Design a protein with these regions (language model features):
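Short beta-strand segments
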Residues: 39-73
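Low-complexity, charge- and small-residue-enriched intrinsically disordered regions
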Residues: 30-42, 48, 130-131, 148
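A short mixed-secondary-structure module that forms the rim of ligand-binding clefts
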Residues: 62-91
Length: 155
């Protein structure tokens, strides 16, 4: 992990421009300067499972009642760190709190979350999952199989 200017840690393979962009997103999200993007982007801080250092990055989220849903293909450091530690610090629209994360493994629940993303905002769905929201069921299930979800609850 490489420390960047705004306190975010990013994998070394991420180029300088991307690191700067992530740092700016964190900076702007923390100040409420991201407009509508703050409706689907949060700031997450995790403790490194190997280094023990804090790592901060913006990620997408969706509210499900009192729970916060995040998604990942499963290969990001923040995702692995949450699974290892079981918790993270989340910042949503200026509110910072500790949250407990749980990997969603139940297939019915995974499909329900995926469908919620698809129907709530098809444009965001298409940007996140890179597939049209009106795709055939078998294509949607193929894409779903590549994604993992973590549900957070405030501690």
């Amino acid at each position: 992990m490489v420390e960047t200017g705004a306190g975010t840690n990013t994998p070394p393979q991420v180029n300088r421009f991307q690191k700067f962009g992530l740092s700016m997103q964190v900076f702007m999200l923390r100040r409420g300067w991201m407009g509508k993007a703050s409706d689907f982007l949060l700031v997450i801080t995790t403790k490194g499972r190997r280094t023990g250092r804090n790592a901060t990055i913006p990620i997408s989220y969706k509210m499900d009642g009192e729970e916060i849903i995040t998604l990942n293909p499963g290969n990001s450091n923040w995702f692995k760190n949450v699974l290892a530690a079981g918790s993270a610090i989340l910042e949503i629209k200026g509110r910072k709190f500790e949250a407990v994360g749980r990997l969603v493994t139940d297939e019915k629940e995974r499909r329900s979350i995926f469908e919620k993303y698809r129907t709530d905002d098809p444009k965001i769905f298409e940007r996140l999952f890179r597939i049209p929201a009106v795709s055939p069921e078998e294509e949607l299930l193929r894409v779903l199989s590549k994604w993992k979800f973590i549900k957070f609850t405030k501690r």
